[in-house]
Amino acid sequence: MSKKKLVSILLSAVLCFGMLGGTFVASAESVSVHLTKTQAVNSSSNVYGTFKYFWGTNSKSSQHSVHYIARYKNGFFWHTGGQYLIAPGHGRDEKNAYMTKKLDYKTDWFLKLNPEGKNTKGCDAWGYMKNA
């Protein structure tokens, strides 16, 4: 095989794998998180953008209110872009979703569910976050 053909095949392979890799890096448009009664905290995977909508429900069977915390990345650090406390048996649907602060740049966001009180468990809650 000629050197020219070999270089051509290798470059084609690199391009193919590069394009494939790029498809797996893409962030989801919406994410969900489920806080179970045995967990003191739980977080969703990341969603990319400048701001988000988030909502959720805290089950009637929960023993505590749950903090719904929208977090975003700035450089190496995570910051809070919105936070609401939802009592047991209450929640918000997607039509009445909370909105995070708006940033002037795109970054990763995630939704964190954290029962009220230090290291508290005993809550069953669902949370959702989506691109605006």
Where are these regions (language model features)?
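Post-signal peptide N-terminal regions of Sec-secreted extracellular proteins
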Residues: S27-A132
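Sec-dependent N-terminal signal peptides of Gram-positive bacterial secreted proteins and lipoproteins
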Residues: M1-A26
